[in-house]
Amino acid sequence: MGKLNDREIASLLSEPIISFITTLNRDGSPHTSPVWHMAQDGKVIVATGSSTVKSNNIAKDPRVSLVAAAGRSPQPWVQINGKAVVSKPE
């Protein structure tokens, strides 16, 4: 599958699929977890508990990578690298 355009990325991120988020452990090694995501206002939101490994890792080092891939063929996927913020629900 070739590179996705912005519309295809938005469509993929709106699907109810499991994504994988990678955070960095204290020693710099990767920690990858399956998560549900929601795309909203140009951001990707992931729900997790405040005491999870990923929350603790993000508090120490906000760099993350999220991969969302649909379970069909050809398999569209997107990888988003950036910085995460841990926040409490409003």
Where are these regions (language model features)?
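Extreme N-terminal tail/first-helix region
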Residues: M1-I18, P74
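A short, Trp-centered hydrophobic/proline-enriched beta-strand micro-motif
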Residues: L13-N25, V64-L66
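Short, acidic, Ser/Thr-enriched surface-loop or helix-capping motifs
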Residues: N25-D27, A39
